[in-house]
Each structure stands twice: as structure tokens, then as C-alpha cells.
């Protein structure tokens, strides 16, 4: 597997409007799914009717999304398009994948990961806005086996890829390849991390519809 970039790979995978709809379903916005990339902690009051007290209130979440880079995990079934694409990835590579939604509404804030590498391959699709995406040559002798790789690392040399991603564009970043995403405008993207080992553990990709 090598780094790759394709224009207009999947137009209309996911939109601001679809994301807005999900954000307003408070039970989905748990602290296990929502990651605000800063070092602060937050407290809030809950309605007596709330079943899960660890869900971000929409007013707080809106404020944080306007100021910080955030990402959301376990999102591979949130729309039919994302679910279908995750199924395609799993069938192609014979491995399980998730979908992580990344959002940056404030292009002036530095990406907290900086230049970093991951321990699994990622297919990243730009959904809204523009991103300058760079990928450098593979790092050898990586000893990490678990976790999320390393962030804010130093690399030398010219990047293998240095592209402006527009809605529908795709970049494939294999494991151990340093990369950096710089938001040019407010942007929304979906990353599909692919597990390293082949296995039969799959999300149920059935999509039901009510008839009539």
C-alpha cells in the first residue's frame, strides 16, 4: 500500500447539513465519541430525563466546534453513504474499518496533531471546505504496536504528496507515513482507519428502511 491522491473520488459523501443533524441528537454526543482537541475539561448540568449524563449539551458543543479542531469516532453508520463506503473498504481489504469525522471551523487554530503518523492505514475524504494535505516518506523501525502513533514529530525532506483537497477528493495514508492536514477554510472530512490484521469482525452494515 502506497500513499495516493484522487480528485473527485467521492463527491457528496457527507455534508455540513447532515453533520448538523447529528450534532442535534444529544444522546449521540457522548464523551466516548466526541474529542475536543485542547487540554481543557468541561462540566455541565443535565436534565433529570437524561439517560446518559456524559453527553455534550448542544450549546456547549457549538461553542467548542467554532473554536477548536474536533473529531468524532464510531461514526461508520451515521449515514447510508458513510456506511456503504465503509462496507466497500472492508470488502476490499478484508479488514474492519471505522469512520472518524474531523471538523475544523476555525482555520486559524493550529492542528494539535501537527505532523504525525498513525499505526493503521487511513482513507481520508474531504467533504466540505479546503485542506492542504502533505504526506512524507515512510518512517522505518517503528516500534509502536498499540495506540495512535506519534504526534508533532520532526521530518526532513520534501513531502511525497502536497495537495489542496477539495470536496470529494481522497488521500490514502498508509501506516507509518508522516502527514499533516492544514485547514485553509472551515472544513469537514471523514477518515476511515483500517485495522492492520485480517479478521471476520465486522460492523453490521445492513441498512433498513420502512416501506410505505
PLM regions and their residue ranges:
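Active-site region of the double-stranded beta-helix
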Residues: 12, 20, 24-167, 177-211
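Short amphipathic alpha-helical segment that frequently serves as the phosphate-/nucleotide-binding helix
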Residues: 16
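Residue-level recognition of conserved beta-strand edge/terminus positions
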Residues: 172-176
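N-terminal low-complexity, Ser/Thr- and acidic-residue-enriched intrinsically disordered segments
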Residues: 1-3
Amino acid at each position: 500500500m502506497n500513499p495516493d491522491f484522487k480528485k473527485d473520488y467521492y463527491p457528496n459523501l457527507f455534508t455540513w447539513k447532515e453533520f448538523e443533524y447529528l450534532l442535534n441528537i444529544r444522546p449521540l454526543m457522548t464523551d466516548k465519541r466526541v474529542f475536543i482537541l485542547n487540554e481543557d475539561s468541561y462540566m455541565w448540568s443535565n436534565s433529570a430525563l437524561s439517560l446518559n449524563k456524559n453527553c455534550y449539551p448542544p450549546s456547549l458543543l457549538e461553542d467548542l466546534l467554532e473554536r477548536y479542531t474536533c473529531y468524532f469516532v464510531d461514526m461508520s453508520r451515521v449515514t447510508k453513504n458513510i456506511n456503504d463506503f465503509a462496507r466497500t473498504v472492508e470488502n476490499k481489504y478484508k479488514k474492519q474499518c471505522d469512520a472518524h469525522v474531523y471538523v475544523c471551523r476555525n482555520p486559524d487554530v493550529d492542528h494539535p496533531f501537527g505532523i504525525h503518523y498513525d499505526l493503521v492505514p487511513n482513507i481520508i475524504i474531504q467533504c466540505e471546505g479546503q485542506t492542504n494535505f502533505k504526506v512524507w516518506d515512510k518512517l522505518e523501525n517503528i516500534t509502536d504496536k498499540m495506540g495512535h502513533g506519534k504526534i508533532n514529530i520532526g521530518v526532513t525532506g520534501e513531502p511525497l504528496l502536497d495537495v489542496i483537497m477539495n470536496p470529494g477528493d481522497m488521500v490514502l495514508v498508509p501506516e507509518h507515513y508522516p502527514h499533516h492536514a492544514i485547514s485553509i477554510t472551515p472544513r469537514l472530512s471523514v477518515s476511515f482507519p483500517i485495522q492492520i490484521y485480517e479478521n471476520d469482525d465486522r460492523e453490521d452494515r445492513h441498512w433498513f428502511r420502512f416501506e410505505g
